[in-house]
Each structure stands twice: as C-alpha cells, then as structure tokens.
Amino acid sequence: MYTILDTICFGMAHLTPLPARRRAAGPVYQRLRDLIVRGRLGPGARVTEAQAAAELGVSRTPVREAMQRLVRDGLLVPANGEHGGRTRLVVAPMEVETLVQLYRLAGTLEGLAGRAVASLPRAARARLARRLSSAELAFRQAATAQPLDYDRLFQRHAAVHQAVIDACAGLELRAALEVIRPRVDRFEWYYAPLVGPDLRVTYREHEAIIRAVRRGTADSVERAMRANWFNGALRLARALAGRAGPLPGAT
C-alpha cells in the first residue's frame, strides 16, 4: 500500500480550466486520465465531481461521464465505506499483483499480434522492421536526453510497441488491448523513474523483437514480444515492492 495525503485530492497547480469548446466529457476524461496515469493524482486520492468541475471550469455532467469511464478503465475505484449515501471514488491502488497480470496480458496479446508478421509480404515486413528501428532509435535518444523528459520517453517507448500493433493486430486484438491500455499506461509511466535510468536490458529486448520481425517467423516474434513484457513486469515489480512512500510524481 502506498502512502499519500488524502487531503491532496486535486492540486490547483495541476488543473486549469478547459476552454469552452473543449468542455465535453472526452477532454475532461483525458485530463483526469492523464493526471492519474502520470501520478499527479496518486493512489488513494479522492476524486469528486464538484471539485473537479470547479477546477476544470466545466459543469458536473461531463465530469460525471468522465468519472464513470475512469471507473470502467479501473483507474477509479470505490473507497471503503459510504459517504452521504453515495459511493466515494478514489484513485485505484498500484499493486504488484495487478502489475504482473496486466503486463502478462499485454505481452500475450501483443505476442499474438506479432505472429501475424509471418503472413506479411516481404516488403511489408521490411517496412515494419525499418519503422521499429526508427522508433527504437527515437526511444534511446529520449532515454539519454538531458534533462530527461518523461512525457517524451513514454511516448517514444509506446511507439515501438505501436508499430507492431499497427502492422499486425486485427480488430479484436486491438479492442482487447484498448481495454487494458489505461491501466498498463499507468504502470508504464512509473517504469523508467523506478527501473531506469539504465535501460540497456530493454534495448536488448527491443533488438530481439526487431531481429524476429526481420526473420519473419511467427514463433520468434511472439516469444520476443512476450519476453519484453514479462521481463518488464518482473523488473518493475521488484522496484515497486522495494519502494516505500508515495510514487514519483504523486505529490
């Protein structure tokens, strides 16, 4: 269990009013989701319609819709007990068991998608390998930049995996990945601050994916994709299990 100050459910520095044209539920959802994924709303922080609406400068209706979606995503959960006849919602805890399950599921799904490499025409497979190499280079550049921009690093890492999904995943696999994406992204955001800054093991695993794509064998791509996620889960689980107090960015 991670310790946070429950009184800090929203910080005025984190939320700014949305322009009138963006006051639908979608932008409200994205703003709240980003705050949770990036740890600015830490595990256990209480989220209320009234305060979120006031600080975002929107009505409570889009906030209510956004919060319902965040509950479906697993990012908001009911607090223990009731308050005033209504369930209080708090940011979901970050538990090692959940991390391992999510990463193994992501690895299994992306591994299944990667098997489709074998059915790609040779030219398409070569294009995918080039895209992966380019994405990996951008990821490494982001990882070694000074000062380190975690937003950019997160995006560049996601682009490596997205290349395989775009080229290989069918509609059903994409839909399944979207279901777990918000919670996976939340753990991914903490990966580099806790496991890094030395990401050479991750680089080697990405290199294995690229080599497997070039070979074009279904089994090798699936193994490489799964290994990257499964091993990443173990690395982050060890880091989370050994950490006390609030997570990076949670305050």
Residues of each region from the PLM?
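Short helix-capping and inter-helix turn/linker motifs at the boundaries of alpha-helical repeat units
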Residues: 23, 78, 151, 155, ...
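Conserved amphipathic alpha-helical segments that form helical-bundle/coiled-coil interaction surfaces
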Residues: 123-190, 202-211, 220-234
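Amphipathic alpha-helical repeat elements characteristic of tetratricopeptide repeat
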Residues: 26, 96, 107, 129, ...
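A ubiquitous short alpha-helical element
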Residues: 94-99, 117-123, 143-148, 168-169, ...
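Short linear motifs at protein or domain termini
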Residues: 1-119, 238-251
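Hydrophobic/aromatic-rich alpha-helical bundle segments in the mid-to-C-terminal region
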Residues: 195-196, 218-222
